[in-house]
Protein backbone atom coordinates (compact mmCIF):
# COMPACT_ATOMS: atom_id res chain seq x y z
CA UNK A 1 0.00 0.00 0.00
CA UNK A 2 1.30 3.44 -0.96
CA UNK A 3 0.04 6.74 0.32
CA UNK A 4 1.04 10.20 -0.75
CA UNK A 5 0.03 13.81 -0.76
CA UNK A 6 0.44 16.49 -3.41
CA UNK A 7 -0.25 20.14 -2.69
CA UNK A 8 -0.52 22.46 -5.69
CA UNK A 9 -1.24 26.12 -5.97
CA UNK A 10 -2.63 26.91 -9.38
CA UNK A 11 -3.09 30.29 -10.91
CA UNK A 12 -3.58 31.96 -14.21
CA UNK A 13 -0.76 34.34 -15.01
CA UNK A 14 1.47 35.09 -17.97
CA UNK A 15 4.56 32.94 -18.37
CA UNK A 16 7.56 33.35 -20.64
CA UNK A 17 8.09 30.71 -23.30
CA UNK A 18 10.87 30.36 -25.87
CA UNK A 19 11.20 29.08 -29.39
CA UNK A 20 14.30 26.98 -30.05
CA UNK A 21 16.07 27.93 -33.28
CA UNK A 22 19.05 26.55 -35.18
CA UNK A 23 20.19 27.09 -38.74
CA UNK A 24 22.50 25.98 -41.49
CA UNK A 25 23.68 28.97 -43.51
CA UNK A 26 23.03 28.80 -47.26
CA UNK A 27 25.96 28.75 -49.66
CA UNK A 28 24.53 30.65 -52.65
CA UNK A 29 21.55 32.60 -51.27
CA UNK A 30 22.16 32.87 -47.51
CA UNK A 31 19.57 35.64 -47.13
CA UNK A 32 16.84 33.34 -48.46
CA UNK A 33 15.44 31.10 -45.72
CA UNK A 34 13.50 27.84 -45.68
CA UNK A 35 11.98 27.04 -42.29
CA UNK A 36 11.37 23.51 -41.09
CA UNK A 37 9.35 23.62 -37.88
CA UNK A 38 7.36 21.75 -35.28
CA UNK A 39 5.99 22.58 -31.83
CA UNK A 40 7.39 21.52 -28.47
CA UNK A 41 4.36 21.86 -26.24
CA UNK A 42 1.51 19.45 -25.56
CA UNK A 43 -1.55 19.24 -23.36
CA UNK A 44 -1.23 17.83 -19.88
CA UNK A 45 -2.60 14.30 -19.90
CA UNK A 46 -2.37 14.55 -23.69
CA UNK A 47 -0.55 12.59 -26.33
CA UNK A 48 2.67 14.60 -26.30
CA UNK A 49 4.70 11.87 -27.94
CA UNK A 50 2.56 12.00 -31.06
CA UNK A 51 1.53 15.67 -30.76
CA UNK A 52 4.16 16.75 -31.23
CA UNK A 53 7.20 14.89 -30.01
CA UNK A 54 7.40 13.08 -33.33
CA UNK A 55 7.42 16.30 -35.35
CA UNK A 56 10.04 17.86 -33.09
CA UNK A 57 12.28 14.82 -33.48
CA UNK A 58 11.93 14.89 -37.28
CA UNK A 59 13.06 18.54 -37.32
CA UNK A 60 16.06 17.76 -35.11
CA UNK A 61 16.93 14.67 -37.12
CA UNK A 62 16.69 16.59 -40.42
CA UNK A 63 19.15 19.17 -39.08
CA UNK A 64 21.49 16.45 -37.83
CA UNK A 65 21.30 14.46 -41.08
CA UNK A 66 22.03 17.50 -43.26
CA UNK A 67 24.99 18.48 -41.09
CA UNK A 68 26.38 14.95 -40.92
CA UNK A 69 25.94 14.33 -44.65
CA UNK A 70 28.04 17.31 -45.60
CA UNK A 71 25.27 18.70 -47.83
CA UNK A 72 25.55 22.43 -48.34
CA UNK A 73 22.06 23.90 -48.87
CA UNK A 74 21.91 26.81 -51.31
CA UNK A 75 19.42 28.64 -49.09
CA UNK A 76 19.64 28.99 -45.32
CA UNK A 77 17.78 26.19 -43.54
CA UNK A 78 16.24 27.37 -40.27
CA UNK A 79 15.00 24.73 -37.85
CA UNK A 80 12.45 26.04 -35.32
CA UNK A 81 10.75 24.28 -32.43
CA UNK A 82 7.85 26.59 -31.55
CA UNK A 83 6.34 27.04 -28.08
CA UNK A 84 2.68 27.61 -27.31
CA UNK A 85 1.13 25.98 -30.40
CA UNK A 86 -1.58 24.23 -28.40
CA UNK A 87 -2.49 27.50 -26.70
CA UNK A 88 -3.11 29.31 -29.99
CA UNK A 89 0.02 29.26 -32.19
CA UNK A 90 1.69 31.68 -29.76
CA UNK A 91 5.34 30.92 -30.52
CA UNK A 92 4.99 30.88 -34.29
CA UNK A 93 2.76 33.98 -34.26
CA UNK A 94 5.35 35.88 -32.21
CA UNK A 95 8.17 34.71 -34.49
CA UNK A 96 6.29 35.58 -37.70
CA UNK A 97 5.33 39.02 -36.37
CA UNK A 98 8.87 39.76 -35.18
CA UNK A 99 10.26 38.78 -38.59
CA UNK A 100 7.50 40.38 -40.70
CA UNK A 101 10.03 42.76 -42.25
CA UNK A 102 12.00 39.75 -43.50
CA UNK A 103 8.97 37.84 -44.84
CA UNK A 104 10.00 38.28 -48.48
CA UNK A 105 13.24 36.41 -47.69
CA UNK A 106 11.42 33.41 -46.20
CA UNK A 107 10.89 31.10 -49.16
CA UNK A 108 8.73 28.50 -47.40
CA UNK A 109 7.65 27.18 -44.02
CA UNK A 110 7.16 23.42 -43.71
CA UNK A 111 5.65 22.33 -40.40
CA UNK A 112 5.53 18.79 -39.07
CA UNK A 113 2.58 18.40 -36.71
CA UNK A 114 1.46 15.00 -37.90
CA UNK A 115 1.84 12.51 -35.10
CA UNK A 116 2.42 8.94 -36.19
CA UNK A 117 -0.13 8.73 -39.00
CA UNK A 118 1.29 7.97 -42.42
CA UNK A 119 1.88 11.09 -44.52
CA UNK A 120 -0.35 10.90 -47.59
CA UNK A 121 0.46 14.12 -49.42
CA UNK A 122 0.03 17.87 -49.33
CA UNK A 123 -2.83 20.38 -49.25
CA UNK A 124 -1.97 23.40 -51.39
CA UNK A 125 -3.17 26.05 -48.89
CA UNK A 126 -4.70 28.12 -51.69
CA UNK A 127 -1.45 28.04 -53.67
CA UNK A 128 -2.80 25.96 -56.55
CA UNK A 129 -0.01 27.31 -58.77
CA UNK A 130 2.33 25.06 -56.75
CA UNK A 131 0.53 21.81 -57.64
CA UNK A 132 3.18 20.68 -60.12
CA UNK A 133 5.99 21.61 -57.74
CA UNK A 134 4.49 19.41 -55.00
CA UNK A 135 3.73 16.62 -57.46
CA UNK A 136 7.42 16.62 -58.45
CA UNK A 137 8.66 16.89 -54.85
CA UNK A 138 6.50 14.00 -53.65
CA UNK A 139 7.12 11.73 -56.68
CA UNK A 140 10.04 9.88 -55.02
CA UNK A 141 7.74 8.76 -52.17
CA UNK A 142 4.72 7.90 -54.32
CA UNK A 143 5.36 4.19 -53.77
CA UNK A 144 4.71 4.84 -50.04
CA UNK A 145 1.29 6.36 -50.78
CA UNK A 146 2.53 9.82 -49.82
CA UNK A 147 2.13 11.72 -53.09
CA UNK A 148 -1.46 13.00 -53.15
CA UNK A 149 -1.59 16.72 -53.94
CA UNK A 150 -4.95 18.35 -53.32
CA UNK A 151 -6.59 21.75 -53.39
CA UNK A 152 -7.64 22.85 -49.95
CA UNK A 153 -6.30 23.95 -46.61
CA UNK A 154 -4.83 22.29 -43.58
CA UNK A 155 -5.39 24.26 -40.41
CA UNK A 156 -4.56 24.23 -36.76
CA UNK A 157 -0.78 24.42 -36.73
CA UNK A 158 2.17 26.79 -36.93
CA UNK A 159 2.47 27.27 -40.71
CA UNK A 160 -0.69 29.40 -40.52
CA UNK A 161 1.15 32.15 -38.62
CA UNK A 162 3.27 32.94 -41.68
CA UNK A 163 0.57 33.03 -44.38
CA UNK A 164 -0.74 36.55 -43.48
CA UNK A 165 2.77 37.86 -44.19
CA UNK A 166 2.79 36.32 -47.67
CA UNK A 167 5.08 33.43 -46.72
CA UNK A 168 4.08 30.09 -48.27
CA UNK A 169 3.40 27.61 -45.49
CA UNK A 170 2.38 23.96 -45.45
CA UNK A 171 1.69 21.03 -43.14
CA UNK A 172 1.51 17.55 -44.65
CA UNK A 173 -1.73 15.57 -44.94
CA UNK A 174 -1.73 12.31 -43.02
CA UNK A 175 -3.83 9.39 -41.92
CA UNK A 176 -5.35 9.88 -38.49
CA UNK A 177 -3.64 6.86 -36.93
CA UNK A 178 -0.17 5.39 -37.23
Each language-model region and where it sits:
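Soluble metallo-hydrolase cores and metallopeptidase-like ectodomains found primarily
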Residues: 1-48, 61-64, 68-69
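A fold-wide structural signal in alpha/beta-hydrolase
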Residues: 59, 76-78, 168
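Alpha-helix N-cap/helix-initiation motif
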Residues: 45-55, 151
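Short glycine-rich loop/turn motifs
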Residues: 17-21, 53, 107
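Short amphipathic alpha-helical face segments that pack within enzyme cores
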Residues: 53-61, 90, 94
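Short helix-loop-beta-strand segments that form the rim/entrance of peptidase-like active sites
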Residues: 65-90
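Metal-dependent peptidase/peptidase-like ectodomains
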Residues: 1, 29, 44, 82-177
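Beta-strand segments within the central parallel beta-sheet cores of soluble alpha/beta enzyme folds
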Residues: 34-37, 74-83, 108-110
Amino acid sequence: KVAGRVDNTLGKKPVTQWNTIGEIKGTEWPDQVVILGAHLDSWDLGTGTTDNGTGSMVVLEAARAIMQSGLKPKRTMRFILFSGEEEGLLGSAAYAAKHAGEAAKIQAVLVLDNGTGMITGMALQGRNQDAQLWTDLLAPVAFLGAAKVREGNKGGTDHLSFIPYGVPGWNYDQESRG
